[in-house]
Amino acid sequence: MCLCAHTSRAQEELDDLLEGFEDELEEIITDQPSDAGPGLWELTGDLSVSASYAYAHTHSDPIKREYRGLAALRTQLRLQLDLNLPRDWRARVSGRGFYDSAYRIQGRRNFTDEALDTSEDELEFQEIWLQGSLLPQLDLKFGRQIVNWGRSETIRVIDVLNPLDNREPGLVDIEDLRLPVVMTKLDYYHGPWTLTGIAVHETRFDENPDFGSEFFPIAVPPPPENTPGNGGSNTEWAAALTGIFSGWDVSLHWARFFDDTAHLELVPAAIGPPRPQLEHARLTMLGASGNYAMGNWLLKAEAAYFDGLEYFVLAGDDKTRWDIMGGLEYAGFDDTTISLDVVRRHISGFDSRLENDPDFVENNRVETAFRYTTEFMNSRLRATYLATIFGTPFDGGGFMRLSCDYELRDALTVGGGIVLYMGGDFPTFEANRKNDRLFFTAKYSF
């Protein structure tokens, strides 16, 4: 359109000089190509190969011998189709599939059926949504999508709407772990404020390590899990009010959702004594968050109140919890970002029995995350150090990751690094303290 307007103005200015050639000039201008707008559709994706080598398991380890050495050799294809529809509406369909050859190389008979079912191969749709404006100030987005409420890159407080893929903890960042769910999201805009209402129709929980997988902490299978159905009375609800201003922003949040962390219950059996079963409590969250930019510094804060927490040893006695997170991010060095986030989770009316099997929770749980990211060679090489540690003073366990990614050319990236797991007071970290690994990735994007 800019080209056409410019051409029109030029034609008017030259009319007096070209009076005898109006028809010829008009024909020439008409035949010139104009700037094309966005196409109706765009298909993108990537093909990647990743491998990890677990070097810390010894021949004397009584468990996880099958994961010694080559722990993963995964080939993955991801595709994303974006559609540009009339009236500025958009749609997306994306999915992925992978196959992990390490299980066949190491011998499939050495692994449990549960581990093979969830980790050897997978084919699934990811984001599938339709988005557009119903009114000038009202937008709709419906379908499988991701809504990130959090301010931290590593720690979750108010970011409760999407479950996580926790099957291989520590290898990638949270932004690559979120799992989309089917939602209806309405956004109403008024000046700097946005009012959001969300209905979550799909019941989906964290994908955790299955029995027999490398990161499953015990040698016996878990009890059966009760997963609520989709929609109806199981619909999850959420709302947010967000204000974005010069140098700072603030938001208020509310959600009524299922706890991703299941608790153990004894449920009546048709015959005989009650049987154990994993259940998901219905929680209510009230939260607030904000960012404040000050020169090269970014201050981050999140706070949330959770009601309805259930535990095995306190059957019928729901608990509440306060999560408060503060963070700093500094970007004053060239091509470098440093961040530190700390969260404290406090259970009100704590009972010391909760510290024991099978609940394993503490009255006050502290989580600290430190991240250092720097770039070299005109941003073609990126190095990241990440440490996430639990407890005070850092006695709960955690992990450290050092990784590098190098862009060989525009569409081809290779990378690798090391992940070190630290044991501690938390049983899960203590069980996985020998899962240290080297990893490598190669990805071609198109």
Where in the sequence are the language-model features?
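Outer-membrane beta-barrel "beta-signal"
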Residues: 190, 420, 432-446
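Detector for outer-membrane/organellar transmembrane beta-barrel domains
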Residues: 255, 291-311, 315-389
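Repeated loop/turn-to-beta-strand initiation elements of outer-membrane beta-barrel proteins
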Residues: 88-91, 137-140, 192-195, 247-250, ...
